[in-house]
Amino acid sequence: MNKKIFLIFLGILFYFGRPLYAAEKMTVLLDWFVNPDHGPIIIAQENGYFNEQGLMVEIIAPADPSAPPKLVAAGQADIAISYQPQLHLQIAEGLPLVRIGTLVATPLNCLLVLEDGPVKTLADLKGRKIGFSVAGVEEALLTGMLTPHGIGLDDIELINVNFSLSPAIMSGQVDAVIGAFRNFELNQMDIEGEKGRCFFLEEEGIPAYDELIYVANPERMNIDQIRRFIKATELATQYIINNPLKSWKIFSGTAKELQNELNELAWADTLPRFALRPAAFDKGRYLEFQNFLKNSGLITMKADISKIAIDVSSD
């Protein structure tokens, strides 16, 4: 009888296949408060994909959006959500960081104007006010977009509106804003009764890039843990694409502040932009954007692409 009970017990363990070891802890720092851009991370947590990969992931929203990459570089967290344009600059500054996966595989940034306003083409921006929130990269993006139209930075007035982008344009403080996310600001304006229109960077001469990426410290990272983390987010992305409404309910059910019209609209607009193969990256695309930054004067030397981005699934 004891032998029979023992065999039944072994059968139950085999059937459920649950690991008998403690999950490995990982800390992930977001770039901002939780929002639809982070869908695969939240769904991986809620659907148990991290747990299936033997990971216990702590997800932290930062008090300072600029801090996460620096904290990862200092070894105080395992992974940070960052931006490809910023990664090139951070590496040029000497921070030990490398892209280990992609969250959002297209630009979200755009140059936003009022649909019924005076700006119909980029050439109409000469002599006008343009709001921004992050100096450096956004100035380079503006230069790249405006130069073909015979406009330089001296021909416009740049105004730091912090992160109050859509209010700045709706109030008339500025004529346009750079740094607006097409999946959020356009929807926010629409909800408030103002129609906006985006000039998309990648359609105006700026090389395409990955808006949101996962970065880690190459000197400290556990490549096996990271590989499993990326696998979990890939499973989550597949679930989201296959179940957009169900995944929205799961995502929005994690916090009351997510349950509003803006986030629901942003969720739908963000889904097509999630990286279906988060581990993979296009070496040529990263090289092209690095060349753009060098030509813009934001970096003085080009780094080997293997020092900027890696495919953890191929290691």
Segments predicted by a language model, with ranges:
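Positively charged n-region of N-terminal signal peptides that target proteins for export
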Residues: 1-5
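Bacterial N-terminal signal peptides
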Residues: 7-17
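Sec/Tat signal peptide C-region and signal peptidase I cleavage site
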Residues: 18-22
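Short, glycine-/small- and polar/acidic-enriched structural segments
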Residues: 25-162, 166-171, 175-183, 198-199, ...
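Pocket-lining segment of extracytoplasmic ligand-binding domains
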Residues: 85, 163-254
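Periplasmic-binding protein-like
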Residues: 103-113, 194-219, 230, 266-270, ...
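Secondary-structure end/capping motifs
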Residues: 222-298
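Conserved C-terminal helix/tail region of periplasmic/extracytoplasmic solute-binding proteins
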Residues: 287-315
